[in-house]
């Protein structure tokens, strides 16, 4: 399981589209607030590893490529803890 407090320090790239609270800033950006950390983690890893294509993959893959497994777990824990 990730560390939500550590995740808050790692969301710098995410906030441009998803905001600090996980509410998508435009209709094409999904809300992350309260989503399952497991779901968020697997989704971000799939983008990073090139397994998820179509939709927002062209935007998300480059954003996720620099993230370690620990970074992803922490970010997922942070956004899933938001209300």
Swiss-Prot record:
- One Pfam entry name: Cytochrom_C
The keyword Heme is annotated on this UniProt entry: yes
Quaternary structure annotation from Swiss-Prot or TrEMBL: Homodimer.
Name of protein: Cytochrome c-554(548)
Which key words tag this protein in UniProt? Electron transport, Heme, Iron, Metal-binding, Transport
Q: Is NADP among the key words of this record?
A: no
GO MF terms, alphabetically ordered? electron transfer activity; heme binding; iron ion binding
Taxonomy-wise, where does this protein's organism fall, top ranks first? Bacteria, Pseudomonadati, Pseudomonadota, Gammaproteobacteria, Oceanospirillales
Provide the record's note on post-translational modification. Binds 1 heme c group covalently per subunit.
PROSITE patterns recorded: CYTC (PS51007)
**Organism name:** Halomonas halodenitrificans (strain ATCC 12084 / NCIMB 8669)
Binding site residues for heme c:
14, 17-18, 63
